[in-house]
Amino acid sequence: QKQGANTLVLEYLHGLGGLSTLGMIGVYWDGFRGGYTAHIDKSVLAMAPKDHPRQPKGEGRFPADWKMEWHRKELLQAGGKLWFGVMGCGALIEGSQVKGVVVATPFGRGVILSKILIDSTGSADIAIAAGAAFDYTGKKTIAVQGAGTGKWAPGDYYNNNDWLFVDDTDILDVSRAFVQAKTKLQGQYDLVKIPQTRERRRIIGDYIISVYDVINHRRYPDTISYHKSSFDTHGMIIDPLFILNPPEKRHKIYDADVPLRCLLPKGLEGILTTGLGASAHRDAMPVIRMQPCLQNQGYAVGYLSALCVKENKSPRKIDIKKVQRHLVKIGNLPERVLTDKEFKGFSNSEMKKAIASVTDNYKGLEILLTDPERCIQLASKQIAGATMPEEKVILASILCILGQGKHAPVLAEAIRQYKDWDEGWHYT
């Protein structure tokens, strides 16, 4: 709205902020806290005097009611409109163009027309209703990140937990989670109003961020948001890299860029999808789902969308460098994004260097797995000349996970040598 575009925000709960407020996750974990997020943080805490008894102790902590009210007031003061108690339940499309959103309201169903629609449901609900392809638990794997349904006592703003698995697109499963929570939290004042989920439906966008993109610090010419976190997986992992070599401990922080094309549902125009609904592999999502980063992403998408309306262009046709210059100016993005180039893939010499080092506890595997075919060729050649049993086991494990089953006997023999289970990995 501040950029001159007519803006309507729809929210089915009674306050803004989602999991950061009514979801009782009012404390930051990791994440990049510069840019627009720094403005939010400072403004929310300035809603009361510094000596107010409810002022949080420590950084990155925000009372839920303060943050909800700041969002509401900021939106209305800028001239935007806000409808509470309204849920998006469909999309109006014409060919590949999204023209509006179907809504369920206390007064019945209706349609709101849009030039640009921002799907910040967190599970790509509107984009998927419009026909966007998506990925989620159940199609290829049963892996899902742990979730919770926390208590809510007067004055609370942080009750983070991880004790259940829930499909928040299934109303029966969500109902089951709340029934279960009422039993688990019997005697508490109240419960959160939305399931505290960490994994949801993700669009198939113009590009899909991979684990390798994050670990290899891939850069893009169309970066729209900057992220910092660890592979805090809260559950099973499925990427071949992590099956062979589990993620490093929680304290290992990665920085990752998210390009605009990961917010654009493939084959659709006039819509962007933010947050946990973005186009990324599920194992990469923990690094790009931190609240501070997504607040900056929300600002960036809002700014870009307003520009699209003013210039009568689609998000794919907008001058991304113009958007980036503004985001760099306010601190959302590092200045390097203005000159970042498209990644062309690793060279043959880089791949050969990686295969030479991979027998040292899988060092360089994140490079090799970016190109499975070349990896198979190099590993097959390497294992043929390997003499050390430990090297053969590592190379055989790589080949087997890429479908080269003839090397399975090497792994079977190695497994037989173990008398006990290892300590495993506590992934919650």
What is each residue range found by the language model?
Residues Q1-A5, A129:
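Alpha-helix C-terminal capping segments
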Residues A5-N6, L10-G90, E94, D135, ...:
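Conserved N-terminal/central alpha/beta ligand/cofactor-binding core
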Residues L13, G60-A64, M68, V287, ...:
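Solvent-exposed, acidic/flexible segments
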Residues I40-V44, M68, G85, C89, ...:
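Flavin (FAD/FMN)-binding glycine-rich loop and adjacent Rossmann-like elements that form
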Residues Q77, P106, K341-I376, E390-E391:
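Amphipathic heptad-repeat coiled-coil/leucine-zipper-like oligomerization helices
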Residues G95-V101:
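Short, hydrophobic/aromatic-rich segments at coil-to-beta transitions
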Residues M351-A356, L378-Q382, V410-I415:
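Buried hydrophobic core positions in alpha-solenoid tandem helical repeats
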Residues D360-E373, K381-G385, E390-Q404, E423-T428:
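Structural detector for internal amphipathic alpha-helices that build alpha-solenoid repeat scaffolds
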